[in-house]
Swiss-Prot record:
A GO molecular-function descriptor: GTP binding
Family: Belongs to the RapZ-like family.
Protein origin, superkingdom: Bacteria
Binding site for ATP: 8-15
Positions bound to GTP: 60-63
Gene3D superfamilies reported for this sequence: P-loop containing nucleotide triphosphate hydrolases (3.40.50.300)
UniProt function note: Displays ATPase and GTPase activities.
Organism encoding this protein: Pseudomonas fluorescens (strain ATCC BAA-477 / NRRL B-23932 / Pf-5)
Keywords on record: ATP-binding, GTP-binding, Nucleotide-binding
Protein name (Swiss-Prot/TrEMBL): Nucleotide-binding protein PFL_0912
A matching Pfam family: PapZ_C
Length: 285
């Protein structure tokens, strides 16, 4: 059995995550009382007609505070039944959450006549502390649109061919901000930039002319060797420490040339030594 627990602050994309999981065969329950987690897992194991039952539930601030405070022990009880259980925590910065509620005119579940939206978001953050501390995968949706969020859920949660640590090597551009959910960040802006070659500007690190240009630069090769040596040495230690997800982010200025080229090469090297290695280019349209 596989159980995915979806949590996060209101407005961060939990409904979208459940929709994606439901589309991929998961039996989904929104706003499950946390105290029912062990019972749900037990019943799913006993009564399911599926050889590999797939269940997803959302648990958030609509729960009783006493149930949320018990989340660590409830999660431990579920996992003691040898159930594959992943906790997905979605979030966004406060300004984005405020904007989303303003645009949709939805009411925050904790807001009231005596509690402003900002105060409700603050209180929600405190209530969800026991869950965020135990999250296996944290996804910040501040800069993600609906389609990007759906793709991220599918990539990180549904495309794992084997159990174990899921590694994501991701390129990005600093001008759009660092990925806040990255575990390791490498800044490669010091390398020669193909952007300043007019014939290469419109291409990306996936295109042969850009790759050939970068491959001929000694500094690029030295950077690649240093990063790959570091990752090959230390990523197995992350896996040995029972980390479910590890994100490695490679950043250049725009996220189109240097970071893309290095991310592709690093992904190829890591896929030869590690299981569950995925590659993503955040800022390529």
């Amino acid at each position: 059995m596989r159980l995915i627990i979806v949590s996060g602050r209101s407005g961060s994309g939990k409904s979208t995550a459940l929709d994606v999981l439901e589309d991929h065969g998961y039996y989904c329950i929104d706003n499950l009382p946390a105290g029912l987690l062990p019972e749900l897992a037990e019943r799913a194991l006993i009564h399911t007609e599926l050889a590999q039952p797939l269940v997803a539930v959302s648990i958030d601030a609509r729960n009783l505070p006493s149930h949320l405070s018990r989340f660590p022990e409830l999660l431990e009880e579920v996992r003691s039944r040898h159930i594959q259980c992943d906790v997905l925590y979605l979030d966004a910065d406060e300004e984005t959450l405020l904007k989303r509620f303003s645009e949709t005119r939805r009411r925050h579940p904790l807001s009231s006549a005596n509690r402003s939206l900002a105060e409700a978001i603050h209180d929600e953050t405190q209530l969800l502390g026991p869950i965020v501390d135990l999250a296996d995968l944290k996804v910040n949706t501040t800069n993600l649109n609906l389609y990007q969020l759906r793709d991220t859920i599918k990539l990180r949660l549904l495309n794992q061919p084997e159990p174990g640590t899921a590694f994501l090597v991701e390129s990005f551009g600093f001008k759009r901000g660092m990925p806040v959910d990255a575990d390791l960040v490498f800044d490669v802006r010091c390398l020669p930039n193909p952007y300043w070659k007019p014939e290469l500007r419109a291409q990306s690190g996936l295109d042969a002319p850009v790759a050939e240009y970068l491959a001929a630069q000694p500094d690029v090769e030295e950077m690649f060797q240093d990063i790959s040596s570091y990752l090959l040495k230390w990523l197995p230690r992350f896996a040995a420490s029972n980390r479910a997800y590890v994100t490695i982010a490679i950043g250049c200025t725009g996220g189109h040339h240097r970071s893309v080229y290095l991310t592709e090469r690093l992904g190829q090297v890591l896929q030869k030594s590690l299981k569950n290695v995925q590659v993503r280019h955040r800022d390529l349209s």
